[in-house]
Swiss-Prot record:
It comes from Anaeromyxobacter sp. (strain K). Belongs to the AdoMet synthase family. K(+) binds at E45. The keyword Magnesium applies. GO terms for biological process: one-carbon metabolic process; S-adenosylmethionine biosynthetic process. This is S-adenosylmethionine synthase.
Length: 388
């Protein structure tokens, strides 16, 4: 029997969090390659610590990339531009250790096979207009508003920050927000009182639906009392360490593979995007109110070795019909995914902060619901509706 009354918590981090800085630099490298060479192969990792950035990986491309310039431009855009923030785009060292992709991998990928083995998941539900779980969507809303407020002139804020939102569910539906945690890097001179007032008024009040907040909602702002040292000075940043923030906030499984810094021949990324595309269209079609899709691949093999659809008991037709409809409507080879979602465009740096899913920008092609009618027809839902 599924749990019906519970609290579920998800977290998000800002673009100035050190791990997200690493993700954005890795994806900035990927975008730079794709602008010049759409067939380039990229597996780029970034590490940041006080005063330096290290870019490493396997990149095979005709493109000419100025890695130090690219890294500094990304850090500058994020907002680290002076030493008092703990990191300065203008003075940081940039180390580069980049080699080419192994020809052993390339021989399988070049013929259309998957770039690695592994399993990937996609998830969707009807809790929010974006068909995302409510906790992660609200957590992202808070961190996005933190960055927006900082850029709009709330100069007591610094780029590093995190949010955590606990949502209360009754009968399996989100009904209220129980707890909001916001931890934000700040100027040393600001008082706790001023910071708390600013975050409540300029961030939380603008980011979260008023109907879900009540007098019992707990709001915790910088619970340790101080957050001056942040960014790479406070914590080492590494690509691929925020994979739950990147996806569904823990509501929905994860295959373990990170996204950022990987070109779409890597199914860790492209098949996870396709999984989201499928799950979202299943829910949008009215076939289920929750849907999780798993696909799995073998390295060098084009077709997935398995496809699974789980609707958690919410399906309007037998799950077997939905699974067959998925195979009928969607191409699941790496080449079909890349072509179907138009993944050879330089659109990835935007994905590297505030979630890869649940976004409304047109460049996020895996968020379209343009297959819902075809899915409903293939699964026989339109016939059921006609009879009813």
């Amino acid at each position: 029997m599924p749990l019906q009354d519970f609290l579920f918590t998800s977290e998000s981090v800002t673009e100035g969090h050190p791990d997200k800085m690493a993700d954005q630099i890795s994806d900035a490298v990927l975008d730079a390659v794709l602008r010049q060479d759409p067939k380039g192969r990229v597996a780029c990792e970034t590490l940041l610590k006080t005063g330096y950035v290290m870019i490493a990986g396997e990149i095979t491309t005709k493109a000419r990339i100025d890695y130090p310039k690219l890294a500094r431009e990304t850090v500058r855009r994020i907002g680290y531009t002076s030493g008092d923030m703990g990191f300065d785009a203008n003075t940081c060292a940039v180390l580069v250790a980049v080699d080419q992709q192994s020809p052993d991998i390339g021989q399988g990928v070049d013929t259309g096979g998957a770039g690695d083995q592994g399993m990937m998941f996609g998830y969707a539900c009807d809790e929010t207009p974006e068909l995302m779980p409510a906790p992660i969507q609200y957590a992202h809303a808070v961190t996005k508003q933190l960055a927006k407020a900082r850029r709009a002139g709330l100069d007591l804020l610094r780029p590093d920050g995190k949010s955590q939102v606990s949502v209360e569910y009754r009968d399996g539906r989100p009904v209220r927000i129980d707890t909001v945690v916001v931890s934000t890097q700040h100027a040393e001179s600001v008082s706790n009182k001023r910071l708390h007032e600013a975050v409540r008024e300029q961030v939380i009040a603008k980011a979260l639906p008023k109907r879900l907040l009540d007098r019992k909602t707990r709001i915790l702002i910088n619970p340790t009392g101080r957050f001056v040292i942040g960014g790479p000075m406070g914590d080492t940043g590494v690509t691929g360490r925020k994979i739950i923030v990147d996806t569904y906030g823990g509501m929905g499984r994860h295959g373990g593979g990170a996204f950022s810094g990987k070109d779409p021949s890597k199914v860790d990324r492209s098949a996870a995007y396709m999984g989201r595309y499928i799950a979202k269209n299943v829910v949008a079609a009215g076939l289920a109110s929750r849907c999780e899709v798993q696909v799995a691949y073998a390295i060098g093999v084009a077709e997935p070795v398995s496809v699974m659809v789980d609707t958690f008991g919410t399906a309007k037709v037998p799950e077997g019909k939905i699974a067959r409809a998925v195979r009928e409507v969607f191409g699941l080879t790496p080449r079909a995914i890349i072509e179907g979602l138009d993944l050879l465009r330089p659109v990835y740096e935007k994905t590297a902060a505030y979630g890869h899913f649940g976004r409304t920008e047109k460049t996020f092609t895996w968020e379209r619901t343009d297959k819902k009618e075809a899915l409903a027809d293939a699964a026989g839902l339109s016939k059921i509706r006609a009879v009813i």
